[in-house]
Amino acid sequence: QPMGWQTPIIVLCAHLNLLENDRERQYEVIQDYISKEIDADTPLILAGDFNDWKKMSSRKLGEKLHLQEALFTHHGKLLPTFPARLPLLSLDRIYVRNLQVKRAWVNTGYPWSSLSDHLPISAEVCPLPNS
């Protein structure tokens, strides 16, 4: 629970498979877990490498679970994160629920481009007003 916040945040990290059929099953498992185990009013962050070549995770998870994608919320579009040295594809996501996205960005340049095959993404969030 962040200092000064009235409620804890649940943070989940995901790394989905490259194969679409596997990702479909993983979407179902993630959706089932969040629906059954996390109260709909609890602040939630779901982030990671979704290997989302076809940009399906927003529809498969976002709409069904009322999640907002942080980069899209802040910039009006998804930003490329892969490959790190010359990013062309948007494979990584930070989804939030019951949180306000203040800022969201892709960490670029050195050392970020040399640490992984993906550029890391970050978001600054705060409680929703009246939370």
Specify the residue positions occupied by each region the protein language model found.
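Active-site regions of metal-assisted phosphoester/phosphodiester hydrolases
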Residues: 1-131
